Regions:
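Acidic/His- and Gly-rich active-site-bordering loop/insert found
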Residues: 9-117, 136-141
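Short, Lys/Arg-enriched N-terminal segments with co-localized hydrophobic residues
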Residues: 1-7
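Acidic/histidine-rich catalytic neighborhood of metal-dependent amide-processing enzymes
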Residues: 120-190
Length: 191
């Protein structure tokens, strides 16, 4: 059992290392899409990008809209027992035009910069590559992975709350894939 787990871990690490440049290109593409909170067109463009990637690995996708945003629910079927909900967001706090004014770049220290790159676009792309790596390694020991990319996390909305409540009822486990804080700090509430 442990040997199989070690082989799986090594296969995932190898996949991630081999696809790092692709990851950076996809992060650049997503970061350079203006998708500020309340920008329905921008959040739709960002979630269409995510949907294309998720469809390529075998997921089904469903878009949900309100007057302010586009939300995406992607579902990847497995052969296991448990359903896992992953939640991230494609919206940012930046207004339309910020991506052109301050486009994605990687500095001399290999840090990525751009509107929303750290909250939460890097995570959005990391989840996609993580799922690709698991699939490439042959891992499907889950009933379903539901990947919800929220279009209104920064400002919150009734639509997002309803979607999370609905998907939570369908899931055995949930992981919020938002950005971490220094020294392993976590955000538990907003003031």
């Amino acid at each position: 059992k442990y040997e199989r787990g070690n082989k799986m871990r090594e296969a995932v690490k190898k996949y991630i290392a081999e696809h790092y440049e692709d990851y950076v290109k996809d992060l650049e593409a997503l970061t350079n899409i203006d998708s500020g909170n309340g920008d329905r067109e921008g959040t739709e463009a960002a979630n269409k990008f995510v949907a294309e990637k998720m469809t390529a690995i075998g997921a089904t996708t469903e878009f949900r809209y309100n007057d302010r945003a586009c939300h995406l629910i992607s579902r990847l079927k497995g052969t296991g027992k448990y359903t896992i909900l992953l939640v991230a967001h494609v919206d940012t706090v930046f207004k339309k035009g910020e991506a052109a004014r301050r486009p994605f770049r990687v500095d001399e220290n290999n840090f990525a910069w751009g509107p929303g790159v750290g909250d939460d676009k890097a995570t959005v792309v990391e989840v996609i590559y993580g799922l690709e790596a698991l699939k490439a390694a042959g891992f499907d020991n889950f009933k379903e992975i539901i990947y919800y990319t929220n279009g209104e996390e920064e400002g919150g909305s009734k639509t997002a709350e309803e979607i999370v409540a609905e998907l939570s009822q369908q899931s055995d486990f949930a992981i919020i894939m938002d950005v971490a804080r220094p020294n392993w700090g976590i955000v538990t509430q907003r003031k």
